[in-house]
């Protein structure tokens, strides 16, 4: 390491070079996390329901988690989204427009015992899914 009177530039450049050894720094600066994200860095996204799917829970749990396969409007990518709530999947039909957000797993991954599912449905045809489940609102007829 340089210690002289005019060493500042060398020290600065060394720090700059060393930062690239950090994986998270490199991914952030090059925008790779946003590029790989189906929502493109946005907090929520809209999509069209392609089909309803049942995802089997991981061990030691035994259940079929009700999910929907959707195609995002903004970029055409297909993702699987979990439908939270008792009987929530019954309010969602094919070709409905749903709003999804991240499910909240660590490092942007899946949550709990639902493998490979990183999103959850929060609204169907611009009506809150939670309100539909508790019976406070009705789904609008198209």
Swiss-Prot record:
Keyword field: Ribonucleoprotein, Ribosomal protein, RNA-binding, rRNA-binding
rRNA-binding keyword on record: yes
KW Iron (keyword) present: no
Gene3D superfamilies linked: Nucleic acid-binding proteins
PROSITE patterns: RIBOSOMAL_S12
Gene Ontology terms: biological process: translation
GO molecular function: rRNA binding; structural constituent of ribosome
GO cellular component, one term: small ribosomal subunit
Protein function: With S4 and S5 plays an important role in translational accuracy. Located at the interface of the 30S and 50S subunits.
The family this protein is said to belong to: Belongs to the universal ribosomal protein uS12 family.
Subunit structure: Part of the 30S ribosomal subunit.
This protein's name: Small ribosomal subunit protein uS12
The encoding gene: rps12
């Amino acid at each position: 390491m340089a210690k002289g009177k005019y060493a500042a530039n060398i020290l600065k450049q060394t720090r700059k070079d060393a930062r690239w050894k950090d994986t998270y720094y490199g991914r952030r600066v090059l925008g790779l996390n946003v590029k790989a994200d189906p929502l493109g860095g946005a907090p929520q996204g809209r999509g069209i329901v392609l089909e309803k799917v049942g995802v089997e829970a991981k061990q030691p749990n035994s259940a079929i988690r009700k999910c929907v396969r959707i195609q995002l409007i903004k970029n055409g990518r297909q993702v699987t989204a979990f439908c939270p709530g008792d009987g929530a999947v019954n309010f969602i039909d094919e070709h409905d427009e749903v709003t999804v957000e991240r499910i909240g797993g660590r490092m942007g991954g899946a949550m709990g015992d639902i493998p490979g599912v990183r999103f959850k449905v929060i609204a169907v045809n611009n009506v809150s899914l939670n309100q539909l489940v508790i019976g406070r609102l009705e789904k609008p007829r198209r």
